[in-house]
Each structure stands twice: as structure tokens, then as C-alpha cells.
Amino acid sequence: MRILFVHPNYHSGGAEIAGNWPPSWVPYLAGHLKKAGFDDIHFIDAMTLNVSHDELRKKFAELQPDLIGVTSITPSIYEAEETLKIAKEVVPNAVRVLGGVHATFMFRQVLSEAPWVDAIVRGEGEEIMVELAKCVSEGRWPEDRASIKGLAFHDGTEIVATQAAPTVKDIDSLKPDWSLIDWKHYIYIPLGVRVAIPNMARGCPFTCSFCSQWKFWRDYRVRSPKAVVDEIEDLVNNYDVGFFILADEEPTINKKKFVEFCQEMIDRGLNHKVKWGINTRVTDIYRDRDLLKFYREAGLVHISLGTEAAAQLKLDLFNKETTVAENKEAIRLLREADIFTEAQFIVGLDNETKETLEETFQMAWDWQPDLANWSMYTPWPFTPLFQELRDQVEVFDFSKYNFVTPIMKPKALTRGELLDGVMKNYRRFYMRKALFHYPWRGTGFRRRYLLGCLKAFLKAGVGRTFYDLGKAGYWGPQTKDTVDFHFDETRKIAEAQVADWEAAADRSRKHKERQEALRAQMKDRAADRNTANFVMPADAEDEFDLSAETHEARSAEHAAMACGGGKDQMVDAAE
């Protein structure tokens, strides 16, 4: 059986300004499928190679796949749907599957607007795809599709979601097949070397209200440091990778394993062969201040910090457990350790003004990170913050949910004024850095890296790809009143998806009511126990067993929920 994976052709001028990034989802899925005996696997990176729809038709006709898998984040969803629509035209007998975070949580929306999609994989895909491939290869599709956990599909006029599949418990068992990647296309511009995106863990124990990763991966699992370094050694020695970014939301959460990972990199001499970067939190920088130089020795050269907002009000709204002062100190600590710092700011909520935009610039310049990014607040439609702000959302064209297009309109600014304010911050920050910092700060690697970053910005700016400025028609302050973001106003939320949201909100409300009632009951019982005439109920020993074993079990259950585990992620269809 022939399996074809396609990465949809979507561009927005965001992270791609630093280079082309290899789609890691393909090697991880392919590796697990090959382990199960499916070895006829092909891959088309339509994004990196800018493959047109006509070229896709030709490739589909040539390959004649039996199973086609496409992924999608929110902004690329329409292109992913169109890719599978083309597949239906050219290879109608192929089973068409869509996965990724957007399809996982918005499956009713996707199946309503793209009925030609045969199935949606909900959640991490390795084990689900193996079961689906077996079903197709054994001729049991579509009759037995309902027996596969983690799918959603049309059954007549109904949209059906099967029971949620369990997460992959032993993630060390996942062996990605990097040979499917044509590595010459994936270059990290600042260093001019091949780049990869392996991962050390899945999930995140934090529940930031604007993020979806903790919901998608459901529980937090960390790989063996040795297994991760084995994978990196393979990438370096066999595919000539010179830079990698760990795909984790925060690889430093588990300090013990991160330290072991760094030591393993040093022990194998990989710190002299490959440089790398991570995303992490300010709190971890504080915690590890005495280890930062050790991390640098292990090859860690670039840390992107989720400082998120200059105003503490925004940090609180995003559930960020840091303060403005801590952000500044974290950047200073990294600078002392000779680790490049990238500060991330989120702008564009309803309380944004010209003054708050100016505040983020002044704060960025005061903190002096090596790099600064201003991202438009993008309300992922499956996050808690979206539900809180739902009445304020006017744009449902998901192709614009890309961190560079102002989805939300601030009360005091037009979208054009917001974009102009962000560009003003970029111009001032990088012009000053280019003139007074990058060419003169440090020697050797530091200078080369900073000038390489400047090259990436200039290349995207001259080509008008940065921040989608060319598409929007922005050429400077004089055009802020004429920019056109080309929102497709015909895009609406499907009735089935709205009903799903309302049902989820109702479940959440009832769960909260039960919790509040239980707290009140426990409070009343505690008050009763303090009275002189209190008599313990006959069944109290079972109900209030406070043995060490019970306490430990309850603590573990609570911890899982606090980390975003369990039913807060992906509710089974039966519930």
C-alpha cells in the first residue's frame, strides 16, 4: 500500500523568515508506520517547494497513493482542505486523511466545510495512523472505521467522533525516519547550515490561556535524554544538520533530564558540531541561573523567551506566571552566559493603544535582548482565551490567524494603525541594533550569528514577505489607512461547531458548579467537626480516608488536571 504525506503550501512571513523548517510530523509518522510494516511512503513538501495546485495534480497522478495524509495548523487549514479536494479529483479511490491541532479540535467545522475529507485524526497521530493504515490495507475501510479510536468522520448526515485514543506512553519507542526529508532545502539563514526540529518532550504542564499545546498533547511526557541525543547524533552525522531547535514548549521544565541531555551532548562532543536553540520561560532562567554557562557549553546558543507583554495586565490575562521585572533580569542573566536572547511580545488585544505599543518598544530597548518579535494576538479558536473573547472576534477567516495579521481590533486603534505601530517598533529596534550593536558587539561566533539574523530580516524585508507586508500593501506610515488584509468575510463558524462549543461550555459550567458545591460541602463539614457535638458518619472512613496511599493518589489526580490533563483536553465522544 502506498502512503503519501503532503505539507500544505501556506506562507505568512512569520517564522519562515529565518529559513525553511523541515516538517517533523512526517518523519515521526513515517517512522512508526515503517515499524508496522508500511514501507512505501512518499512526501511532498508543498510549502517549502512552493508546489502549485497544478503540480500537485501531476504528482498525485504519478504516485497513485492509496492513503493521503495532510496536516494543518489553523492558518493553513483551507490550503490543507484544498489539497485533499484535489486528491479526490485525481485519485478518488485514495483515503483522504487530515490531522493536526486545528482539525483535532475543530473537526466539526472542518468536516462541515470540507465534506470530501474521509477522516480526521484527533490528537497525536502515530498509533492512530498505524491502525488506520491497517484498516485500509486489509480492505476493512470504511466499514470498520468506527472501531479506530481517535477519528472523526461523516456517517451519512452525521459527524461522528470515536473515543479519544490514548496518548503514546513510551515516546522513546518513536523512531523518526529522517530519510524522507530532502535536506538541501532546509537551511537556517543566520548560520547558513541545515536545520532540524526534534523534540525532547510532548505536552506542557502549564495552561496558558492563549495556547493549545497543553490541550493537544494532553499529558506531559519526557523522552530519555540518551534517546534524544541518539536522534541528534543521527541528524548531525548522517544528514549534516548544523542547527536544531527543540520543538518542545519548554524543554527546561524537567531540570534533571535537561541537565542530563546537555551533559550527554558534551560527552559525545556534539556541542562542537551543532548549535541549538529552545523556547522557555523566565522562571526557568531564574531557577537555572547557575547552570546557564553549562547550557552554553552544551551548544545552546539561542533562547526565545515568552515575555509576552510589557503590561502586567496582559501577563495576568495570558496566565503567565512572571512579572515585568523578572523578564528584564532573565535577559541580563542570559547575556552574561553568552546565550542569544529573543524576547517575544504579544500585541493587539482590545486594550492596545499607541501608548502601550510605545511601552513595549521602550521596554524591549531597556531590556536589550539580541532579538525582539512583536506578534499579533491570535485567538486560536480552540483555546480558553478565545471563548472568553468570543464576542469580540470579528474575523473567522482562519487563513489570517498567523500571528502577523491583526485579527482583533483594539478599541483605540484601526488595524492599519496597529500594524503601523508594530512596524515602527521593528524599524527602530533593528535599525539601532544594526548600526550600534550587531557589527561591534563580540567577536567570532557572536558577531557572525547576529549579522546572520540581520541578514534574514533584511532578506524578508526587501522581498516584502516579512509580516505579509506585500500582501497587505503596507509600505510605511503613509499607507496605514489603505492597507487591505483581504479577510474572506464569507467564512463563518459552522453550526455544528457552534453547537459543540456550547456543549463544551455547558459541561465546563456543570463541572465548575459541582466543584463549588463540593467545596461548600467540605467547608460545612469542617465547621461541623469543630463543634462539640459532632459525630463522624458511619461511612466516613471510606469517604475521608486520608491514608498516605489515598493522599498520594488524589494528589496525582490533581496534578494531572493542573497540567492540563484528562477531560479538559479531548473529551470522549461518549461523554
UniProtKB/Swiss-Prot annotation:
In what residue span(s) does the B12-binding domain sit?
Answer: 9-143
Q: Which NCBIfam families match?
A: BchE (TIGR02026)
Q: Which cofactor does it need?
A: [4Fe-4S] cluster; adenosylcob(III)alamin
> What does the UniProt function comment say about this protein?
Involved in the tetrapyrrole biosynthetic pathways leading to chlorophyll and bacteriochlorophyll (BChl). Catalyzes the anaerobic formation of the isocyclic ring (E-ring) in Mg-protoporphyrin monomethyl ester (MPE) to yield protochlorophyllide a (PChlide a) via a six-electron oxidation and the formation of an oxo group at position C13 using oxygen from a water molecule.
InterPro entries (UniProt xref)? Cobalamin-bd (IPR006158), Cobalamin-bd_sf (IPR036724), Elp3/MiaA/NifB-like_rSAM (IPR006638), Methyltransferase_Class_B (IPR034466), rSAM (IPR007197), rSAM_horseshoe (IPR023404), Tetrapyrrole_Bchl_Biosynth_MTs (IPR051198)
* Cofactor binding note of this UniProt entry: Binds 1 [4Fe-4S] cluster. Binds 1 adenosylcobalamin.
Which residues of this UniProt protein bind [4Fe-4S] cluster?
A: 204, 208, 211
Keywords, ordered alphabetically: 4Fe-4S, Bacteriochlorophyll biosynthesis, Chlorophyll biosynthesis, Cobalamin, Cobalt, Iron, Iron-sulfur, Metal-binding, Oxidoreductase, Photosynthesis, S-adenosyl-L-methionine
**Pathway(s) annotated for this protein in UniProt:** Porphyrin-containing compound metabolism; bacteriochlorophyll biosynthesis (light-independent)
Q: What EC number(s) does the entry state?
A: 1.21.98.3
Q: Please list the residue ranges annotated as the Radical SAM core domain.
A: 190-417
List where Basic and acidic residues composition bias occurs.
513-525
Recorded hits in SUPFAM superfamilies, A to Z, give: Cobalamin (vitamin B12)-binding domain, Radical SAM enzymes
Q: Describe the family membership recorded for this protein in Swiss-Prot or TrEMBL.
A: Belongs to the BchE family.
Q: Which GO terms describe its biological process?
A: bacteriochlorophyll biosynthetic process; light-independent bacteriochlorophyll biosynthetic process; photosynthesis
Q: Which reaction does it catalyse?
A: Mg-protoporphyrin IX 13-monomethyl ester + 3 S-adenosyl-L-methionine + H2O = 3,8-divinyl protochlorophyllide a + 3 5'-deoxyadenosine + 3 L-methionine + 4 H(+)
Q: Which domain of life is it from?
A: Bacteria
* GO MF, any single term: oxidoreductase activity
Protein name, per record: Anaerobic magnesium-protoporphyrin IX monomethyl ester cyclase
> Entry's Pfam families?
B12-binding (PF02310), Radical_SAM (PF04055)
Q: What class of enzyme is it?
A: oxidoreductase
- How is this protein annotated for GO cellular component? cytosol
